[in-house]
Swiss-Prot record:
Keyword check for GTP-binding: yes
GO terms for biological process, alphabetical: ribosome biogenesis
Gene: der
Record protein name field: GTPase Der
GO MF annotation: an example: GTP binding
Coiled coil: none
Domain EngA-type G: 9-171, 201-372
Cystines in this chain: none
Binding-site residues, GTP 2: 207-214, 254-258, 318-321
Length: 462
């Protein structure tokens, strides 16, 4: 075990009650030492323990919650601030499922003032779709933030690596390793910017009743698990099926068909709720449209579910062999009625005859790669700079509107922040222009692109 040549490095875990401090302490210590519960303020004393992080011995402190209205709050706060002052690094934990409060921001900045070597740890970000919530914590004004889920063990390894780097402990172990071992540990030059987690692509099949969703599922999986019938609404519970394409697992969910709201009764209301929950876990939606008859208003409303859940999307035109009109007419109508999905790929098929099924499978993987894409920061800023030079931002009542820089803060879907002097002055039409520019420059096939404007002061404060 490696230790610092001097005294042990000390890490203090601070934050308000019930945000997961003790759970993180237990996770890092790999033992259930601190009491954890849903009751705010279970930790009152400072728990101290020597632990090993990737072979390095450090001292970990778990402190009592710093809530303003807590019993003994003054004493606890004083103790916490003393711990912050004496520590080499602070992990300030917040609840990612809650809205940041002014009190929490004030406490964080007070701690940061005492010890700037401080990480903002956003807990309870249980899956990729919840990362957008973490963006709200940019108001804390620190670039040193980490999204984790202690209960799901997500983001813990990245946090530990950052902790060791901040404490200059990784350098110590590297000096002790043989050069050949170090070479074998190095990341190849052509590796992705982010470590790619082994993940199953979750695909929701959506559409109104009797458009052929179950037939599509059967064709994709080559099974007959999903009941196919001419009777509308034979699928009630979402049905999961997993297939393997190369080394990539894809899980399909055949959701219940959606009717007009006025026709939703009894068990179909339950089915609609299950459909919504299934989409919450999905990465990509296959929107199945029946082209044996003209599109209806409900098709457009259902397509909005993909936008609501920020999903990648592929349009599946089923029953193409008995289409109601020529190709050109259908495509023109599709473009007019679904203009907000102009980035979505379109595939024609006849599910019962299993036409173009392999194309759908490979398109899912292609869209998922776009959905997971991260643009290098330098390249992103180069494109944004060129776009603003080509078409300058409109002024705000005669005052200059400027983009300082851009950064992609999340994937699945890609989410980009523009750090500006007047974020509220960014007009919707100019935002759309920038999004279209990014789509043209980078391949975001079938992928929603989220662009937010933030104030420089709130987004980046040392």
């Amino acid at each position: 075990m490696n230790t610092s040549p001097k005294t042990l490095k000390t890490i203090a875990i601070l934050g308000q009650p019930n945000v997961g401090k003790s759970s993180l302490f237990n996770r890092l210590a790999r033992e259930r030492i601190a009491i954890t519960s849903d009751f705010a303020g279970t930790t009152r004393d400072i728990n101290k323990r020597k632990i090993a992080l990737n072979g390095h011995e450090v001292e970990l402190l778990d402190t009592g919650g710093m809530a303003k209205d807590a019993l003994l709050s003054k004493e606890i706060k004083a103790l916490n601030l003393k711990a912050a002052q004496m520590s080499d690094l602070i992990l300030y934990v917040v609840d990612g499922k809650s809205i940041p409060s002014d009190e929490d921001i004030k406490l964080f900045r007070e701690v940061f003032k005492i010890n700037p070597n401080c990480f903002l740890v956003i807990n309870k970000i249980d899956n990729d779709k919840e990362k957008e919530r973490a963006y709200a914590f940019s108001s804390f004004g620190t670039p040193k933030s980490f999204n984790i889920s202690v209960s799901h063990n997500r983001g813990i390894s990245a946090l530990i690596d950052a902790v060791l780097n901040a404490l200059n402990l990784n350098q110590i172990i590297e000096q002790d390793l043989d050069a050949d071992i170090l070479e074998s540990l190095e990341t190849p030059n052509n590796a992705l910017e982010e470590t790619k987690e082994e993940e199953i692509i979750q695909v929701g099949i959506i559409g109104r009743v009797n458009v052929g969703k179950s037939s599509l599922l059967n064709a994709l999986t080559k099974k007959e698990r999903s009941l196919v019938s001419s009777v509308a609404g034979t699928t009630i519970d979402p049905i999961d099926e997993t297939i393997l394409i190369g080394d990539q697992k894809i899980c399909f969910v055949d959701t219940a068909g959606i009717r007009h709201r006025g026709k939703i009764l009894g068990i179909e209301k339950y089915a609609l709720e299950r459909t919504q929950k299934a989409l919450e876990k999905s990465h990509i939606a296959l929107l199945v449209l029946d082209v044996s008859t003209p599109f209806v208003e409900l098709d457009e409303k259902i397509s909005s579910l993909a936008d609501k859940h920020s999903l990648g999307i592929i349009l599946i035109l089923n029953k193409w062999d008995i289409r109601y009109a020529p190709y050109e007419e259908i495509m023109a109508t599709l473009k007019r009625k679904f203009r907000f999905l102009e980035y979505a790929p379109v595939i024609t098929t006849s599910c019962l005859k299993a036409r173009h099924i392999d194309e759908i499978k490979h398109k899912i993987i292609e869209v998922y790669e776009c959905f997971s894409k991260r643009i290098p920061t330098s390249l992103l800023n180069s494109v944004i700079s060129q776009a603003t030079q080509k078409h300058p931002l409109p002024s705000d009542g005669g005052k200059l509107v400027k983009v300082y820089y851009a950064t992609q803060f999340a994937t699945k879907p890609p989410q980009i922040s523009l750090i500006m002097n007047r974020p509220k002055a960014l007009h919707f039409s100019y935002k759309r222009y920038l999004i279209n520019t990014l789509r043209k420059e980078f391949n975001f096939l079938g992928t929603p692109l989220i662009l937010n404007a933030k104030d420089k002061k709130s987004a980046q404060q040392n």
